[in-house]
């Protein structure tokens, strides 16, 4: 997400706390927040796919749900 969009989210947030938002501004804020959350979730999921959990003995103890998610992503890429 661009810096301009993040700045606009913050600007709208400040307006909402001080003078309130018009209906158009509220709709813009909601759309920008949804875009931000979508980008955040995607980035977080991509980061999780790089994680491997090991115990003290070096055994892979990555949760099965994460392994399955990694496998599904790999299938979509190939």
Curated annotation (Swiss-Prot):
Q: Where in the cell is it found?
A: Cytoplasm
GO CC terms of this entry: cytoplasm
Gene3D superfamilies assigned to the protein according to its UniProt record, in alphabetical order:
Helix hairpin bin (1.10.287.540)
What are the boundaries of the region Disordered?
Answer: 56-78
Q: Does the keyword Ligase apply?
A: no
User: Per UniProt, which keywords does this protein have?
Assistant: Cytoplasm
InterPro entries listed in its UniProt record: DUF896
In the record, the note on similarity to other proteins reads: Belongs to the UPF0291 family.
This chain belongs to the protein called: UPF0291 protein ABC2165
Q: Which organism is it from?
A: Shouchella clausii (strain KSM-K16) (Alkalihalobacillus clausii)
